[in-house]
Amino acid sequence: MEIEKNYRINSLFEFYQPLLTKKQNDYLELYYGDDYSLGEIAENFHVSRQAVYDNIKRTESILEDYEAKLHLYAEFQVRNQQADRIQRYVRENYPDDATLNHLVNHLESLEEE
């Protein structure tokens, strides 16, 4: 469960990072991206562990709120699943069509950007 939560928060962070404050960005990057403890972050920013914890929890809630309103991550997941299905279908049914395979690969690379 914890791994899934971390993955989700990291994914939401990728989508909504520009909407967060610098402090929110810094705390989440250190906590989820660099695996810092609350104590290490608190020490770096000269604040209490509780202040860091509260900020991270509040920021997680903000990210979930953005996703509930904008659905960027959910739509990205759907597009990725569809792109995977198309890619599988083309590889299975048109393995010799170099142009089609190239176009599908290009589509997949665009989605990853």
UniProtKB/Swiss-Prot annotation:
Top-rank taxon, per record: Bacteria
Membrane-spanning ranges: none
InterPro entries: RNA_pol_sigma_r3/r4-like (IPR013324), UPF0122 (IPR007394), UPF0122_fam_protein (IPR054831), WH-like_DNA-bd_sf (IPR036388)
Pfam families tied to this protein: UPF0122 (PF04297)
Task of the protein: Might take part in the signal recognition particle (SRP) pathway. This is inferred from the conservation of its genetic proximity to ftsY/ffh. May be a regulatory protein.
Record-stated family: Belongs to the UPF0122 family.
Protein name: UPF0122 protein Lreu_1156
The species this protein was found in: Limosilactobacillus reuteri (strain DSM 20016)
Lineage: Bacteria, Bacillati, Bacillota, Bacilli, Lactobacillales
